C-alpha cells in the first residue's frame, strides 16, 4: 500500500490534508490479503503520529477504512473498520473537545464539537457495532471513559471517510448572533434526522445539545 511521504523526514508526511479528505469515499470490495495489507498500513501510520485513530484518506489512500487504538496494551481497545458506515444516530448530542492530525493547530488547541451520544456502525469485517457514551464512567478519576472516547473517535474517523472534518462539527451559536434574535423570538430548528421544530430562541441551547441546528 503506497503512502504519502515526506522526503525531508524520510517518513510519513505528518498532518496530511490530502484531496481525499474533502470527498466521500465509497465502499469497495477487498480481498483478505488487501484488507490485511491496509490494516498494517494504517497501524504503521498511526504508530508515527500522536493520535488515537487514523483514516486511510489521511494517508492519501482512497479506501474506506480506518484504524483506532485507545488506551494501554492491557485495558485499551483497537479496531480496524473496513467500509464503515454509520447507520443510526441518537437524537441526543454531547459536547467534546477534539483535535485532528490533519489540522495541526487543533492538536494544542482542540475545537469544541458536538457528537451523537449513541451510534450504530455497519462494517464489512466486524458486522454491526454499537457505541454509546458513558456519563457515569466519565466521572471516575475525572477521566473520559473508554466508552465515551470510542464513541467520539469512531465518529471522527468515519467523518474523514465522508469528507467531513471537525471544523464541520464545531459547536457554535454564531449564526444566532448574526441574526440578533431576541430571547422570546421564535426560530425553526432541524434535528440530525431532519425533523423541524419551532421554539423560542431562549430554549435554543437545549436543542443545540441534541444536535439540532437553526434553519
Predicted ranges, named:
Residues 1-188, 192-198, 202-215:
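Positively charged
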Amino acid at each position: 500500500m503506497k503512502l504519502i511521504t515526506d522526503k525531508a523526514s524520510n517518513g510519513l508526511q505528518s498532518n496530511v490534508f490530502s484531496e481525499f479528505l474533502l470527498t466521500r469515499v465509497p465502499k469497495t470490495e477487498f480481498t483478505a490479503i488487501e484488507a490485511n495489507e491496509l490494516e498494517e498500513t494504517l497501524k504503521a501510520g498511526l504508530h508515527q503520529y500522536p493520535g488515537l485513530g487514523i483514516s486511510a484518506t489521511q494517508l492519501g489512500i482512497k479506501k474506506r477504512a480506518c484504524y483506532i487504538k485507545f488506551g494501554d496494551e492491557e485495558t485499551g481497545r483497537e479496531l480496524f473498520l473496513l467500509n464503515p458506515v454509520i447507520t443510526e444516530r441518537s437524537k441526543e448530542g454531547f459536547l467534546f473537545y477534539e483535535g485532528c492530525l490533519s489540522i495541526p493547530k487543533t492538536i494544542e488547541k482542540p475545537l469544541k464539537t458536538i457528537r451523537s451520544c449513541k451510534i450504530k456502525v455497519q462494517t464489512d469485517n466486524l458486522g454491526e457495532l454499537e457505541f454509546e457514551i458513558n456519563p457515569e464512567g466519565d466521572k471516575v478519576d475525572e477521566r473520559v471513559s473508554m466508552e465515551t472516547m470510542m464513541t467520539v473517535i469512531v465518529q471522527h474517523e468515519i467523518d474523514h471517510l465522508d469528507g467531513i472534518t471537525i471544523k464541520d462539527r464545531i459547536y457554535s451559536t454564531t449564526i444566532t448572533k448574526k441574526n440578533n434574535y431576541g430571547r422570546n423570538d421564535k426560530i425553526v430548528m432541524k434535528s440530525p434526522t431532519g425533523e423541524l421544530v419551532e421554539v423560542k430562541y431562549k430554549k435554543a441551547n437545549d436543542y443545540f445539545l441534541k444536535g439540532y441546528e437553526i434553519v
